[in-house]
A protein has these predicted regions:
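N-terminal "first-domain core" detector
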Residues: 1-39
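Hydrophobic beta-strand residues in large extracellular and virion-surface proteins
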Residues: 9, 13, 32, 44-46, ...
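Short linear motifs in intrinsically disordered
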Residues: 22-23, 43-47, 96-104
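Generic recognition of long tandem-repeat/solenoid scaffolds
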Residues: 28-37, 53-58, 105-117
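Intrinsically disordered, low-complexity regulatory segments enriched in Ser/Thr/Pro
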Residues: 39-80, 121-138
Length: 138
């Protein structure tokens, strides 16, 4: 990862999650990742896309964390993005975020919250592994 956002993010990831196996990957597409807690969930990967951070959960889904206010000074935007990603990762590692996938569709929401829609053959996961199917999923 390059740039100040990446540098700040990496330092915060190392400090907040010292025992999670953080990996830093340099190269053409620099990235930070955490190894999977369960093979069906896969690794979490964080990409610095310049003015946003993208989080991918293996092949299940991905999402973008963008600045809430693009008019803020760069340092404030970066701090806000990093803190939101830190809170999200804490919730993920605490199994408080539910990931789902159905064919080529996927997403996440807070555990216990109702998903935006219902898809046939939807599979659900938390960081520690798969969740049982609900009646509404069949």
């Amino acid at each position: 990862m390059t740039g100040t956002l990446s540098e700040k993010l990496i330092a915060r990831l190392r400090a907040r999650f010292p025992n999670r196996g953080l990996r830093i990957h340099e190269g053409k597409e620099p990235v930070a990742s955490f190894p999977a807690a369960h093979p069906e969930v896969g690794d979490i990967r964080i990409d610095d896309d310049g003015d946003e951070l993208a989080i991918s959960v293996a092949e299940l889904t991905h999402g973008h964390f963008t600045p809430r206010d693009y008019q803020l000074p760069s340092q404030e935007k970066e701090e806000d993005l990093i803190e939101r990603v830190m809170r999200f990762l804490e919730q993920v590692f605490d199994d408080q975020v539910e990931f789902w996938t159905a064919g080529k569709a996927g997403g996440w929401h807070g555990r216990g919250e109702k998903p935006i829609g219902c898809w046939p053959n939807r599979r659900r996961f938390v960081w520690s592994g798969p969740l049982p199917a609900h009646e509404e999923d069949s």
